[in-house]
């Protein structure tokens, strides 16, 4: 059954205080490249930026990572897939304080009683009196323990290892422990810093290594968001793909299939029941994944929830996602007018397409400095489209271009001296008087 109008109005009224599901949030494990026994657990929405802070390249490092004799730090593992900052902080605290966490079964944490460590290089157990809280084996064992707990095992998280020796310790511990992880928790490897020299390793660490390649934005679902907006704003009648009832676009919470070729939409509650019915599980209240009732493609629940939360709560994030990036070197708020044709009656995208199809180069007579347009400035901005009087155009385009009549440097200096007193105390204008181009001639 679709949610009531009253409940939906409460959701829409609270859009200003409720943020959408974050694009990325993770808990991470740091290890000192100088002293491997020094480890640190934290959380962040941007691992590359946070790693740069810990290494002193940016401000904001944690107190425990400020010591220069322990830098640089490397990020050896992350746990991602949290649906909110609060959820990530909750898991971070439980990982740091597993012994006192209510989500951990201490009877199964045998490593704290035996004090067993696993050597990352050999993969063999080492008995000793080392502090169990600071050992890599103990931290990974606590991670495995939390992921097996009834609370965290339901979360759609992913464990990613960036170091082969740390992953080796993880695999050895899996062979020692009795419990297994939930099938919905994925464990992936991303080794890029192994098998290289120490110099190359430090250079990669300075650039965040493989951590810097993680997608921490909404770019992965950009086409999905655009497709949903187009489908729901089209105005046509849309029926639920599960219950076949008409969808009320203004009131119903609607889930759209993430596959580009499928136009299936359904009530969120109907689709959830459909997923859980296919799963045939009475213990789960929220599904992890399912199949589309129309195209039978695989759908991830978290991806669909991100799109819905962006549509209902994240108008700023959506605007930022589809905002056209300003070209490097172009002043803020000013587009690259010199290479953009603007036809009357066409939008910005349509005028760009029109210029490409017709091959027209429309010159914008906008000054690049306080002085009148000079030859060097014209050539630099227009890439050789504007040419010297009496000369030949640098391009092979046969379309007509407008070339202003240039003044000599002495004439320009005299004119500047006459107008300097009039402009004193006033802000310099960045526009050109149209009378300056009364004598402009069209070269055919």
Curated annotation (Swiss-Prot):
Residues 323-355, 386-444 are annotated as: Disordered. InterPro entries: GIY-YIG_endonuc, GIY-YIG_endonuc_sf, Slx1, SLX1_C, SLX1_endonuclease, Znf_RING/FYVE/PHD. Its main location: nucleus. It is found in: Nucleus. Its cofactor is a divalent metal cation. Its EC number is 3.1.-.-. Keywords: DNA damage, DNA recombination, DNA repair, Endonuclease, Hydrolase, Metal-binding, Nuclease, Nucleus, Zinc, Zinc-finger. Residues 23-105 form the GIY-YIG domain. A zinc finger (SLX1-type) spans 240-295. Pfam families: GIY-YIG, SLX1_C. GO terms for biological process: double-strand break repair via homologous recombination. CDD domains: GIY-YIG_SLX1. One of its GO terms (cellular component) is Slx1-Slx4 complex. It is an enzyme of class 3 (hydrolase). GO terms for molecular function: 5'-flap endonuclease activity; crossover junction DNA endonuclease activity; zinc ion binding. HAMAP family: Endonuc_su_Slx1. Belongs to the SLX1 family. Catalytic subunit of the SLX1-SLX4 structure-specific endonuclease that resolves DNA secondary structures generated during DNA repair and recombination. Has endonuclease activity towards branched DNA substrates, introducing single-strand cuts in duplex DNA close to junctions with ss-DNA. PANTHER family: STRUCTURE-SPECIFIC ENDONUCLEASE SUBUNIT SLX1. Forms a heterodimer with SLX4. This is Structure-specific endonuclease subunit SLX1. It comes from Paracoccidioides brasiliensis (strain Pb18).
């Amino acid at each position: 059954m679709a949610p009531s109008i009253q409940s939906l109005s409460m959701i829409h009224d609270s859009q200003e205080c409720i943020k959408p599901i974050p694009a990325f949030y993770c808990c991470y494990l740091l290890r000192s490249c100088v002293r491997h026994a020094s480890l640190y657990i934290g959380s962040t929405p941007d691992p590359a930026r946070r790693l740069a802070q810990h290494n002193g390249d940016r401000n904001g490092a944690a107190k425990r990572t400020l010591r220069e004799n322990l830098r640089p730090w490397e990020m050896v593992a992350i746990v991602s897939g949290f649906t909110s900052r609060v959820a990530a902080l909750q898991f971070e605290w439980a990982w740091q304080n597993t012994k006192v966490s209510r989500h951990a079964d201490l009877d199964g944490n045998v490593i704290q009683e035996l004090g067993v460590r696993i050597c990352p290089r050999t993969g063999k157990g080492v008995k000793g009196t080392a502090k169990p809280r600071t050992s890599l084996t103990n931290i990974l064992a606590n991670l495995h323990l939390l992921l097996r707990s009834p609370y965290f095992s339901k979360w759609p998280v992913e464990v990613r290892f960036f170091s082969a020796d740390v992953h080796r310790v993880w695999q050895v511990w899996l062979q020692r422990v009795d419990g297994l992880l939930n099938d919905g928790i994925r464990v992936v490897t991303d080794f890029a810093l192994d098998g290289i020299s120490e110099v190359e390793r430090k250079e990669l660490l300075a650039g965040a290594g493989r951590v810097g390649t993680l997608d921490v934005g909404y770019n992965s679902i950009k086409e999905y968001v655009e497709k949903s907006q187009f489908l729901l704003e089209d105005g046509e009648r849309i029926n639920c793909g599960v219950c076949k009832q008409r969808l009320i676009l203004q009131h119903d919470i609607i889930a759209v299939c993430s596959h580009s070729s499928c136009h299936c939409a359904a009530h969120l509650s109907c689709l959830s029941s459909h997923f859980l019915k296919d799963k045939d599980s009475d213990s789960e209240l929220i599904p992890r994944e399912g199949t589309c009732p129309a195209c039978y493609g695989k759908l991830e629940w978290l991806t669909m929830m991100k799109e819905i939360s962006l549509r209902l709560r994240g108008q700023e994030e959506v605007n930022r996602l589809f905002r056209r990036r300003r070209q490097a070197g172009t002043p803020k708020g000013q587009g690259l007018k010199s290479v953009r044709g603007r036809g009357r009656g066409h939008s910005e995208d349509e005028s760009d397409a029109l210029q490409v199809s017709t091959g027209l180069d429309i010159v914008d007579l906008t000054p690049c400095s306080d002085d009148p347009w000079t030859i060097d400035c014209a050539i630099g901005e227009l890439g050789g489209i504007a040419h010297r009087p009496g000369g030949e155009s640098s391009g092979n385009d046969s379309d007509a271009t407008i070339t202003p009549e240039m003044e000599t440097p002495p004439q320009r200096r005299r004119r500047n001296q006459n107008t300097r007193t009039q402009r004193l105390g006033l802000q310099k204008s960045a526009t050109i008087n149209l009378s300056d181009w009364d004598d402009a001639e069209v070269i055919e």
